[in-house]
Amino acid sequence: MFEALNGWTDAPNAIATVVSTRVMPPFVAVCMAAVLNLVGALSGTAVAATIGKGVIDIDSGISLQTVACGALGVVVWGGFCVYLKLPVSKSHGLLSGLAGAAVQEIGFDALIWDGWSKVFEGMAFSLFAGFVGAFVVMTVIIWIFHKAQPSGMRRNFGHLQIFSSAFMAWSHGTSDGQKAMGAMALALSLIHI
């Protein structure tokens, strides 16, 4: 349920621009996003490893019900926010849900603090890198194209939109696809599979 909610609310963002500007037909854009999400999910294990064994100590005595409660909490919270049209991060929600359920069952000893420091560093870095990257890219675009006619730029930026949409779909797979795999790995490790 968690990954279905996550895909329903987050995955369309990767193709929204190319579909709304009619650079790609919806069917082609959805197919591209599906393939690249899968490729992204299978292209690494860093996120899955962090979620699966880097933030919650499976030897602390947490149960499979703990993982289920953490995931269910995200589904309820995410569905509630979607219903009210509020922005929500299922990544933060999953981590918080798993942590909250583990702390409720075992206490703070269930948390792996080194793993949490990596998570918080990643969050802080992504905010900073996103701001700086967007600022630099926008500055370069304005500087290069400030005298260009908008009508002539549609085709060029259309190709760039396809590239950025493809990259967003792949990135969504590397992050959110692996996040779900990590939660499943955590659950499977609790039942010793």
Predicted segments, located by residue:
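Structural signature of hydrophobic alpha-helical transmembrane segments
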Residues: 3, 60-71
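Short, non-helical or kinked segments that cap or interrupt transmembrane helices
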Residues: 8-15, 23, 84-96, 177-184
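Membrane-interface alpha-helices at helix entry/exit sites of multi-pass transporters
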Residues: 22-34
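Membrane interface segments of multi-pass transport proteins and intramembrane proteases
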Residues: 141-156
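Conserved small/polar residues in nucleotide/adenosyl-binding loops
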Residues: 191-193
